[in-house]
Amino acid sequence: MNESLFLALMDPAGAPAHPLVFLVLGVVTFALHMTAVNVMLGTLGLAAVGSFSSNPYWQRLSGALGTTAKAAVAVAIVLGVAPLLFVQVIYDPFWYTSNVISAWWLLGFLAVLTVAYLALYRWYGLNHSYADDGTPSSRPGAPRGGFWLAGSLLLMIVCGAIMHAVVNQSLQPAEWMNWYAPGGTIVPYGRELHSLTIGRLAFFLLLSLPVTAAWLFGMRRYLLSSDETDYGYVDFIEGLAHAMAKAGAVLVLAAGALWMAALPENMEWFRTSVWMWIALVPIAYFGAMSFIQKKRKLCIFCNYMAFGMTIIMTIVLAAVREVLRFVTLLDAAGWNALDYKITMDWPSTAIFFVTFLVLGGLNLSYLLTLAWKSGQTKDLYTPSSGLTRVGTLAIASHICWVAGYFIIGWIVING
């Protein structure tokens, strides 16, 4: 490969902060994005199964998890923007070239995701009614429209396959000319996906099993804390969580082995590196999660911490994934992301962290606390004065941010 060509494609404006900042933020935000994706896939799959079941516990779980999946899609989309932007900053020629090679599929991704989301909302509409004030309530009886859930799940998996292929293509610059001009004939249509690795795709999709199992362990404890009286339903959720945790660990390990066996030549170094062994730590935790929850069944903190631990383990996997990309592109194209030119932009850096920490912190704290408290109240929930103040501050932070956005823009334009 002509390494000087790739170095010439670096953005002459440089990165607005040290590249290490983007690498770390990329890992963390990708892990959070994948956690939301895995919750979405797992709850959507369980909701689809429950919608076709005659078991009343499955039917009840279908209604609850279908609503969870709907929210998880929104969270996954929001959290997916940040890692995408970080990749574009420090791996720009690789990401953009891969996008162009499969341009039709990238554009199709947006359409497929939209249809999948609409299908999920169609199911939600079939199973909920609305009061005059707009308050939704679940319709009685068995869930309706299970085919909408199944269709949504299938389309979400298609979205995952598209993004998987595009990322894979970006790591194989030596193949770009073969894909763009096979046999010397230029094919500029972007209608093909050129690099589908079943093991890699399955690995990230199957992570939804242990992650959703951890979600169910927390859900079980949440129901008990909310004075749930149907203990048969609680036991049903617990049994399902244990089964998913055990099966998920085995399947993720098998998919990982398949992925390692199918690594292309420029990534084979990873098999004998210490990073592969580090990647086994999260899988080992997933395998032990069921045992830990059985031993700590009465530990409230432990039940909730199962999901927190899956986030930490996903961050570990995301870090190992980033090492694979970093070293592969360093060897294949001489691309060292840490050598990226730095043109320090303190205002944009400050705006990012203020947005992420202040706006994100206030709004998430308010929404999560509100959801938590209201879910544990059988009657109409009235927020405390302290929580109401947090909500007021959250709204005020949004107003200030939007106003600041336009004020800064006006100042820059009018210099």
Which stretches of residues belong to each language-model region?
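Juxtamembrane boundary at the C-terminal end of a transmembrane helix
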Residues: 3, 326, 403-415
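Long, contiguous internal "core" modules enriched in hydrophobic/ aromatic residues
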Residues: 131-281
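N-terminal signal-anchor module of multipass membrane proteins
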Residues: 1-73
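Hydrophobic alpha-helical membrane-insertion segments
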Residues: 70-79, 148-170, 247-252, 302-321, ...
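Membrane-interface helix-loop-helix modules in multi-pass inner-membrane proteins
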Residues: 72-151, 253-287, 408-409
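Membrane-interfacial helical/loop segments at transmembrane boundaries in membrane proteins
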Residues: 1-3, 173-190, 325-344
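Juxtamembrane membrane-water interface segments of multi-pass membrane proteins
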Residues: 43-68, 85-96, 123-141, 214-243, ...
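Short aromatic-rich membrane-water interface segments that cap or initiate transmembrane helices
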Residues: 20-34, 97-110, 184-205, 271-276, ...
